Amino acid sequence: PESWCAEAFDEEKIKSDSIVNRNMDIYTEDIRLLTPNARFILFDACFNGSFHLDDNIVGSYIFNKGKTIATMGCTVNTIQDKWPDEFLGLLAAGMRIGQFTRFTCFLENHLIGDPTFHFTNNAGLDMDINQALVAQEGNVTFWKKQLNSPMADMQAMALRQLSMANYSGLVELLKKSYHESNYFVVRLEALRLLALNYPTEVADVLQTAMNDSYELIRRYAVEYVEKNCNPELLPAWIESYLLRGHENRHRFRIFSAINTFDHDMALNELKKQAADWSFYDSSYVNELLEYLPRQKKGLERDFALIDSPESTTKQIQSEISRFRNKPIAKAIEPLLNIIKNESQEEELRILAAETLGWYNLYYNKADIIKELNTFRTSNQKLMNEVTKTINRLKSQNR
């Protein structure tokens, strides 16, 4: 209504609105008027750790009359669905903030303050956790014993340490830990280590994890399914949507992964499973039924644009780059064809090779490595990128 805008340019109204807006947020000037008593602050939002700016939130806590010793925050944006408090429970066991950062740091996440700071060990852990993390690194016998620790975070750390030590029985241990542990931090650690390092063996755990009782595990599981692309996961993926489609964040992850599986197979599986259900409100099912065919057509257009001789280099670059964040199985063959095409522009061939390096969680990445290992070209820049991609696909994740 026009009445809403009547006072839009009134000086008093502008002043009043600005005060309301100012009071809705916390600014560095507000913090400097306080005396913060928190020794360590973990910020889980964008820009709070922007130490490269003259004025920033983390600095306002550190350079203050208060008692804050260390902070952790992001310089720009925070990635979604991360696990920022992984191993946080070990702070109660006296783990140094620097060690906490070493095991949990994400891109653009920074520790500002004293990394040697630690709290008093009041968790009942009968060891120096900081000494163990350094002196016992690689000691399989020691960390296997910690699997029986009364602390859930210590059990999770034991799994991480055994992974770092390349323990020979790790895959079965991780599966056992996921299926049998009552602690969500242990289950999530097991799931992550399996999905990140053993994509060919993780299918059975992912099938279960998409309906885990802990919401973050469910969301991580759907994200890993998107990167794994194993067609065996399709029935469980559809079932998770029928069970959890009413959850906004779970639904968002499902729709983000809409191109993971063959669209026709996914549509048939959805119809098959939905036929056995009784719905109070089936609108969310109908939404996916309508979305799958639309996305199929959209993906076909994308591939047609890549193959079209009329497409510009910039257009093809844009399409190829999408498969870095969305490494779907259907894009592998087109990317390999671009790499092998000697008449194709060099920058597109290099980009295609680099993009395949993002398939490090793909269940059948061994086939990609095999294809790239047999590839030969006189173009040294392209060959260097192919070699880097092979190394990316073979590398171990933390």
Language model region names:
Residues G59-T68, D85-H110, E201, Y214-I217, ...:
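C-terminal, active-site-flanking charged/polar segments
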Residues Q131-A132, Q155-A165, V185-N197, R218-N230, ...:
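Structural detector for internal amphipathic alpha-helices that build alpha-solenoid repeat scaffolds
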Residues P84-S168, R187-E189:
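Caspase-like cysteine protease fold
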Residues P1-D85:
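Catalytic cores of nucleophile-dependent amide-cleaving enzymes
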Residues D44-F47, G73-V76, T104, P115, ...:
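Active-site proximal loops enriched in glycine and acidic residues that flank catalytic Cys/His/Asp
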Residues Q136-Q146, Y167-Y178, P199-M210, N230-L242, ...:
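Amphipathic alpha-helical scaffolding segments comprising HEAT/armadillo-like alpha-solenoid repeats
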